[in-house]
C-alpha cells in the first residue's frame, strides 16, 4: 500500500494516507500540511528524534518509526480513467440491462438488482460480489459496493459503512443497509457531511439550530406544532428541500432508477468554471471570461442549443485581505471560504440577452457589460463561473408573435432592413462557428485558436488539453 496523491485537488488518496487524516478531496496544500503534522509526530517518537530516511510504503513506515513519511504525487490521466470506466461499465452489461443502470459519475453506478436475483439464484451480496470479481479479473481493479433497499441507502452504505469495514482478500468491501439498520447504525453518525447530499452549508445551518445527526433531524421532523423542534423549523431553513432531507433522515427515498431515466428537467443550463492558478487582476480575469464565453457558446452550437440568459460569478482571492495594503483599501463585505479564510464577498450577476441565441458576439457583449458592472476593479480574482440558463434546442425557439403600435414617424422599412442585416450577420457567424467545430473535432481543440488565447495569462489552450479540469 502506497501513499498516493493527485494534484491539485486530490481525485483519490490511498487508505494509507487516510490514516494520517487526509480527506479524499483535499487540496494539495492541505495534504502537504497534514503530512508535515504527521512527520512532526513521527519525529517526536523516532529514536534519537532523528529521521534516517524516507518511505511511502505504509508497512515499512509502521515497522520503522525512524523513517519520514513521504508520498507519491501522481498526475491525473483522465482519458485513461474514462477508458477503464467504459470497460467496467461493459462488464456490468454482461449481467444487467442498461435501463437498470444509472451512471452517477466516472467511478460510480447505481444498479437495480430487483429483477435479477430470483433468476440468478443469488442474493444481493452474492450478485454484487460476482460482478466485482469479474471486474477484478478483467481489469485488475477492485471495487466497493453498497447495497440498500433504495438508492439513498445503497449510496450511504457504500460511502459510510463499506469504507469503514475490513476488506476481503481481494480488497473488496460490501455493506448492506435497510431502513431499520440505517437508523440503528447511522442515526448518531457524525459529521453530517458524510451523508449524500448534505454539504457544508446544510450542515452549518443544522448545527446552528442544534441538529448534529440524522437522528436529530428525524426526531425534529416528528415534533409537535408547539415544539421548537418540528418539521416547520426544517422547512423554514431549507424550503421545499426539507422534504428530501426528512426522507433521508428516516432512510426513505421514493426515487428509483426508472424515475431517473424518465426525468426531463423543466429548465436546462450549461456552464463551466475554473479556479485560476494564481490571482488575476481585473483585466486579466476579463480575458479569461472572454475565453470561457467563447468555449461555452461553441458548446451550445455543437449541441444545437441556444440561450437567452447568462449568469456570472466571480470569486476573489484571499490576498485581497491578507495583504495589509489591500485590506486597508477594501471597504466591502467580507465572507469566510470553505477553509475558514476571510475573502471579499464574491460578485454575482445575470445578463439577459433579449433573444435566444448562440452568437459569440451577442453573448460576449452582454457578459462583458455585466462583468464591468459587477466586478471590483481593485480586487484580485481567483474563481470564475459562467452558466447559460434557459437552454433550449434551436428548433424549439418560440416564434415572434408580438403586436406593435405603428406610428407615422418610424421608418419601418429601415428597421426591417436592419433586422435582415443582423440576421444575415448572425447566420455568417454560425457558419464560421460550425467550421471551427469541424476543424477542432478533426485536428484537436488547439488546432485553431484566437489571438486572445495566446495572450499572457490565457488559459484556454491549456484547458483544451484537460478533461474535467484535470490533465487528460
Regions found by a protein language model. Give the residues of each.
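A short glycine-rich, hydrophobically flanked beta-strand micro-motif that places a catalytic Asp/Glu
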Residues: 3, 143-147, 308-312, 382-385
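Acidic, metal-coordinating catalytic segment for phosphate/diphosphate chemistry
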Residues: 340-472
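Short, small-residue-biased leader/transition segments that mark boundaries at the very start
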Residues: 1-11
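DNA-contacting surface of Y-family translesion DNA polymerases
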Residues: 194, 202-381, 401
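Gly/Gly-Pro- and Ser/Thr-rich, intrinsically disordered tail segments characteristic of DNA damage-repair
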Residues: 9-257, 413-472
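Short clusters of hydrophobic/aromatic residues that line enzyme substrate/ligand-binding pockets
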Residues: 174-177, 192, 270, 351, ...
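Glycine-rich beta-alpha junction loops
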Residues: 149, 316-318, 390-392
Amino acid at each position: 500500500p502506497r501513499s498516493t496523491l493527485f494534484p491539485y485537488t486530490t481525485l483519490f488518496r490511498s487508505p494509507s494516507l487516510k490514516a494520517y487524516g487526509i480527506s479524499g478531496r483535499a487540496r494539495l496544500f492541505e495534504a502537504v500540511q497534514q503530512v508535515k503534522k504527521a512527520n512532526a509526530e513521527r519525529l517526536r517518537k523516532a529514536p534519537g528524534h532523528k529521521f534516517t530516511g524516507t518511505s511511502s510504503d505504509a508497512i515499512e513506515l509502521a515497522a520503522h518509526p525512524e523513517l519520514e513519511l513521504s508520498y507519491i504525487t501522481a498526475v491525473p490521466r483522465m482519458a485513461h480513467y474514462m477508458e477503464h470506466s467504459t470497460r467496467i461499465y461493459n462488464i456490468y452489461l454482461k449481467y444487467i440491462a442498461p435501463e437498470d443502470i444509472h451512471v452517477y459519475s466516472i467511478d460510480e453506478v447505481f444498479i437495480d438488482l430487483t429483477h435479477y436475483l430470483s433468476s440468478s439464484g443469488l442474493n444481493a451480496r452474492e450478485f454484487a460480489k460476482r460482478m466485482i470479481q469479474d471486474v477484478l479479473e478483467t481489469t485488475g481493479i477492485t471495487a466497493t459496493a453498497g447495497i440498500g433497499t433504495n438508492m439513498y441507502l445503497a449510496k450511504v452504505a457504500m460511502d459510510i459503512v463499506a469504507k469503514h469495514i475490513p476488506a476481503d482478500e481481494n480488497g473488496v468491501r460490501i455493506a448492506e443497509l435497510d431502513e431499520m439498520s440505517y437508523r440503528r447504525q447511522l442515526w448518531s453518525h457524525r459529521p453530517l457531511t458524510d451523508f449524500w447530499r448534505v454539504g457544508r452549508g446544510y450542515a452549518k445551518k443544522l448545527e446552528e439550530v442544534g441538529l448534529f445527526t440524522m437522528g436529530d433531524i428525524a426526531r425534529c421532523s416528528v415534533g409537535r406544532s408547539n415544539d421548537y423542534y418540528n418539521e416547520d423549523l426544517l422547512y423554514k431553513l431549507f424550503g421545499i428541500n426539507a422534504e428530501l432531507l426528512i426522507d433521508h433522515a428516516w432512510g426513505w427515498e421514493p426515487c428509483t432508477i426508472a424515475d431517473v431515466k424518465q426525468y426531463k428537467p423543466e429548465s436546462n443550463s450549461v456552464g463551466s468554471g475554473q479556479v485560476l492558478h494564481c490571482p488575476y487582476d481585473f483585466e486579466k480575469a476579463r480575458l479569461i471570461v472572454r475565453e470561457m464565453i467563447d468555449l461555452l457558446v461553441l458548446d451550445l452550437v455543437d449541441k444545437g442549443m441556444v440561450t437567452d440568459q447568462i449568469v456570472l460569478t466571480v470569486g476573489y482571492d484571499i490576498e485581497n485581505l491578507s495583504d495589509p495594503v489591500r485590506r486597508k483599501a477594501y471597504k466591502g463585505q467580507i465572507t469566510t471560504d470553505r477553509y475558514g479564510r476571510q475573502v471579499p464577498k464574491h460578485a454575482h450577476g445575470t445578463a439577459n440577452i433579449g433573444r435566444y441565441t448562440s452568437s459569440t458576439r451577442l453573448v460576449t457583449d452582454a457578459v462583458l457589460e455585466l462583468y464591468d458592472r459587477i466586478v471590483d476593479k481593485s480586487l484580485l480574482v481567483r474563481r470564475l463561473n459562467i452558466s447559460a440558463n434557459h437552454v433550449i434546442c434551436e428548433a424549439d425557439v418560440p416564434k415572434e408573435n408580438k403586436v406593435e403600435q405603428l406610428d407615422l414617424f418610424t421608418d419601418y422599412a429601415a428597421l426591417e432592413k436592419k433586422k435582415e442585416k443582423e440576421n444575415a450577420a448572425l447566420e455568417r457567424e454560425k457558419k464560421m462557428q460550425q467550421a471551427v467545430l469541424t476543424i477542432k473535432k478533426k485536428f484537436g481543440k488547439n488546432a485553431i485558436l484566437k489571438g486572445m488565447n495566446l495572450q499572457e495569462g490565457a488559459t484556454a489552450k491549456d484547458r483544451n488539453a484537460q478533461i474535467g479540469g484535470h490533465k487528460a
